[in-house]
Amino acid sequence: MSAPSDDPPVAVITGVGRSRGIGTAVASALRDDGWRVVTAGWRRYDRLMPWGADDIPLADIEADLADPSTLAMVLERANELAGPVCAMILCHCESVDSTILDTSVESFDRHVAINARATWLLIKAFVEQFAGPPGTGRVAAITSDHTAFNMPYGASKAAIDRIVLAAAVESAALGITCNVINPGATDTGWMDFSTAAAVRARNLQPRLGAPADCANLVRFLCSPNGQWINGQLLYSDGGLRP
């Protein structure tokens, strides 16, 4: 077991690129809890999406996670910036709406590369470098239950569930907990008025999910009190009904 350290624990958070994003909310929450946070993002993705980029400062690490050669670099750079990493929070995604009929092979492959393959390789790199005391390692990944009209996103996100749950078993000897979070429909700026109204109507609580809702669950999982929760797919969606 490693000797205790007074240094703040270090977390890497991917998918940090917009002020209203889940990744940004998680970064803020963990900083408030005393973590040293290293953010990773890809500003070009947000510029290409309908909601666009905003004026949030650039992430500590800019990386296109579709390129497998960049993934080990994310952990290496985080170690250089902040020290040994003991939490990996995966909030990144590729999400371009399309159907079974009109999804291109290129789009499908990019969704799988970013949402599934990058998740696997980032967890792999994290586990390989983890040297903290048993019980202090954390992995949390954001998933989705989308299916129709967002097929490549939903299919590639579903793979995350299996990757992370496998990691919970395979990294148990190191004392790393691994969980998946489904935050439901979260108001990060992508909903138009009619979509937001439809989501509210399906929720047991009369509001939209906020990025802070998901961030609050992540901060609990990353706390000592979250150590007993492991290998789970957790819903933090306010009771969203199909």
Q: What is each of the regions a protein language model found here?
A:
Residues S2, R202, R219, N230-P242:
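Short C-terminal tail/terminal secondary-structure segment
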Residues A3-V38:
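Canonical Rossmann dinucleotide-binding motif of NAD(H)/NADP(H)-dependent dehydrogenases/reductases
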Residues G15-G17, A131, T136-A173, A185:
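Catalytic loop of short-chain dehydrogenase/reductase
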Residues C91-D97, G238-G239:
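Conserved NAD(P)H cofactor-binding loop of Rossmann-fold oxidoreductase domains
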Residues T99-I100, S107-D109, V199:
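Substrate-binding pocket helix/loop in short-chain dehydrogenase/reductase
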Residues A172-T177, I229-G231:
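Short, small/polar-rich loop/turn modules that mediate ligand/substrate recognition or access, typified
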Residues N203-C214, N225:
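A conserved structural motif in NAD(P)-dependent oxidoreductases
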